[in-house]
Amino acid sequence: MITSLERFTNLGPSSINDLEMERDFIRDTLEVLRATGEISNDAFLDAGTIQGGLSLLLNLLTQGITEAEASLQLNSLKERAGSLSRTYPDLDSKVESMRK
C-alpha cells in the first residue's frame, strides 16, 4: 500500500481524479484479496484505513484545503501504510500484483 501512496507527492485539485482512481483500485483489490483468502480479515480491515484516509483526503481537497494541508494528510497516510507494511509484510506486493 505504500507503493500506491508513493505515487503522489504534490496534491491539489488536479490530483483529485488520480486519487479517486487509486482509492477505488485499493478498495477493489482488497476485496478480491480477502475473498480469495490471500489476505486475512484483519489485514483487510487494517488496510481499509488507507482507503478511508484517501476518501477523507479527497473530501478535503474538494473543499479547497491548501496543498500544505493535503501534504500533511498524505504524509500521515504514508506513515500508516509503512506501519501496515511492517505488520503485513506481503500486503504491498499482493496489492501491486493486482495492478494492470
Predicted regions mapped to residue ranges:
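Exposed, low-complexity/repetitive linear segments and helix-based recognition motifs
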Residues: 3, 17-19, 25, 43, ...
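Amphipathic, soluble alpha-helical interaction motifs
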Residues: 29-32, 36, 57-60, 87, ...
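Short, flexible coil/linker elements and helix-boundary hinge sites characteristic
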Residues: 10, 37, 63, 88-89
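Amphipathic protein-protein interaction modules
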Residues: 40-79
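Charged, amphipathic alpha-helical oligomerization/scaffolding segments
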Residues: 14, 18-21, 25-28, 49, ...
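Amphipathic alpha-helical binding modules
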Residues: 65-100
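Short terminal alpha-helical segments
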Residues: 1-36
